[in-house]
Every structure is written in structure tokens, then in C-alpha cells.
């Protein structure tokens, strides 16, 4: 509770601070991350008009603390023993621009030469290690500076040093809890941001207003599939003509009906032949054991019986 109350008090104090000396920073932020992505801005046409020239934006110390980028880097390296190495510097848009709701804020590491160092010590629970690198900012047009993407851009694909975690905290005018503590800059200072030099898995910066759409990584499975496909093409071709002709004949109803009818007729003929052979064999066996009188050779003509002589004793 005490920590939350302290944060609220610091945020309220930050809202009452007045801007100090303006600072000029040359903007060199990749244009693909400056796309509105759904933000309807009258000053932004959205058409691809080619590479846009670099613009120079004047940055002033915060007056409202609503249009800020907050990038918090948490290193995995051993934490330093001194807490004086951390201070917070927030960069905002020019005072004449109005913030938009839901805009993310970036928290960058800066030199510990500000008037709110003591307050930051109280609000910070653990020290952080800062790497001093000059911040480069780039805005395609002056209209883009009025949108939510005009400040420091952090790449969503992991453009942070290894071991550092990136946290984005959206802020709104009605949500002061997520706003950073107030820091009053006494003069021109160089912003220090933890940035990673490597830009792997990023599409090249496109011309116009297009934002980087997607980043695809080629996996081993896709490569394996691509290697298998040529093997399938190198196989010997099948005679599609003969196969298609045979399948076409079988698919025709009249041909299929003729084949079935011929098979049935052949089966009936074979059964009749076997039955006839069995019948002949049976009749032959019956004739060999017959007791009937043999037929006469003359065709059945009448013959006078022979007279038998009797002998008496």
C-alpha cells in the first residue's frame, strides 16, 4: 500500500511539472513500426509514396506525462550494489500535441543527474544495470509524430539485448497508476537506451507507410518436405493411357452387364455338361447288370418256335 501511494503521489507531482529546456534529437526509427495499424489519422494517407525523409523532432521535458514510451529493461546479469546508477528519463511529444488513449509508453535508462534521483531511489525496489547507447529516432512525417507511434520504437521481435526483458505498459489519461515518476531535466542530456544491435528475423524496411507485417522462420520440417518433392517427381511415369482405357471399359454399364451375363451362361453350360456325363455313366452301369432279353436282330419279326422232340424210354 505504501508503494502504491508513493507511485500515485509521484504521478500527481509529474502532472504539475512544467516543461524545461527543449532538446533536439535526430529521429532514425525504422518506418515499418510507425504504422498506425488501425489508427484513423487525417494526416496519414497510408499510400506507399516511397522512402520518406528523416525529420528532426524537438523533444521537451514532460508537461503532461501522457504521451510517452516506457521501455523497462531488466538484466539477468548480477545486479549492481549501488542504486545510484538508475534514473528515469521519459521522452514525450511536443507540448502542442494531444495524447491518444491506449498509447504505450517507453521507459528508457538515463544518466543519474536529475533532481528526482532521491524519489527514484525510494520508488525502486532493486537496482538495474544500464548500458549507455545513443537513442536514434526517426519519424516519416510530421503527422506521424502526432500519432501514438512517434516516440521511441521498440521492436516486438526481440530487439533487446540478450537477457533483458521488454515490458510495455499502455497508459491512458484516466489511468495515472501506470505513469512513471516525475523527472525534471536541468539541461540537455544524452538519452541512454538498452538496444540490441542484431536485427534477426526482421523484414527489410518497406517504402511508404506499411508496417512490418509478419516474420517467418524456416523450419526443418518445411525443408524436409521441399527435399522430398523432387524425389516424387523423379519416379518413373505410369502408363496412364492403358490404365484409363481399362477403367473406362469397366465403368461402362453395357460392358459390365455383358461380362456378368457371359459368366452366368458359362457357369450354366458347365453344370449341364457335368450332369449329362453323370447320367451317361449311371445308364452304362445299369445296362451291364440288366436281365432283360436281348432284342432280335431282324427287327422283331415273328419266328416259329422250333419243335422239340421228346424221347420216351
Curated annotation (Swiss-Prot):
Segments on the Extracellular side according to the record's topology features: 23-257
GO molecular function terms noted in the UniProt entry: cargo receptor activity; extracellular matrix binding; identical protein binding
UniProt membrane topology term: Single-pass type I membrane protein
Transmembrane region(s): 258-278
Region entry Disordered, spans: 27-58, 95-186, 286-313
Alphabetized SMART domains for the sequence: 4.1m (SM00294)
GO CC, alphabetical: cell surface; external side of plasma membrane; extracellular region; plasma membrane; protein-containing complex
Site annotation Cleavage of ectodomain: residues: 253-254
Comp. bias intervals (Acidic residues): 32-42
Cellular compartment(s): Membrane; Secreted; Secreted, Extracellular exosome
Entry-linked InterPro entries: Neurexin-like (IPR003585), Syndecan (IPR001050), Syndecan/Neurexin_dom (IPR027789), Syndecan_CS (IPR030479)
Record PTM text: Shedding is enhanced by a number of factors such as heparanase, thrombin or EGF. Also by stress and wound healing. PMA-mediated shedding is inhibited by TIMP3.
Pfam families: Syndecan
Parts of the chain on the Cytoplasmic side: 279-313
Protein keywords: Glycoprotein, Heparan sulfate, Membrane, Phosphoprotein, Proteoglycan, Secreted, Signal, Transmembrane, Transmembrane helix
Glycosylation site list: 37, 43, 45, 47, 209, 219
Leader sequence segment: 1-22
Record function comment: Cell surface proteoglycan that contains both heparan sulfate and chondroitin sulfate and that links the cytoskeleton to the interstitial matrix. Regulates exosome biogenesis in concert with SDCBP and PDCD6IP. Able to induce its own expression in dental mesenchymal cells and also in the neighboring dental epithelial cells via an MSX1-mediated pathway.
Family: Belongs to the syndecan proteoglycan family.
Subunit: Interacts with CDCP1. Interacts (via C-terminus) with TIAM1 (via PDZ domain). Interacts with MDK.
Protein name: Syndecan-1
Gene that this sequence comes from: Sdc1
